[in-house]
Amino acid sequence: TAAALAEAVPQAAGMIAAGVAEAAPEAAADVAGSLAEANPAAAALIATSVAQAAPELAGDIAADMAAVNPEAMAGAVANIAATVAAADPDLAADIAGDMAAINPNAAGAIANVVSAQAPEAAAEAAAALIQANPDAAGAIAAGVAAQAPEAAADAATALVEANPDAAAAIVGGMANANPDAVADVAGAMME
């Protein structure tokens, strides 16, 4: 069975989950769940494989995998967010929020990779990320400024609206990551 194969060969679990996600998306969650039960160590690989094969399923599958193996998934969230954002920028903000819900401490890293892969979604992703982890405002701002400077002003505005107390951290994070962008950012925030 697929579960037995997943137990024996963790790489197979990712391939099976990806194949099902592509061929029969409605069955992907059940299959991924049984594969991860058979081999919890493969949880992150399963989630990453599904993200590549069927980006629109990545958030739900990753949440399921986080319930099975939270430690492995905590380390995989930025990679999954990057994969989905690259495949479909329209999903970038949603996947950023979903991944930060799994590992709030990765909010800065997620901002960095999503901004790099889908700069047009960077500001919206930043807003989703600060909802998941308001304390990471500076790190989120830095990630956007470093990878998508053209989105920095919009992102800063969204971040300050979400967490006004973090305004200094937001501008500071952006200034550290991209000094050239910070004048525009400060100006936008004062408007």
Write out the residue ranges for each language-model feature.
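General marker for long, soluble alpha-helical cores
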Residues: 1-191
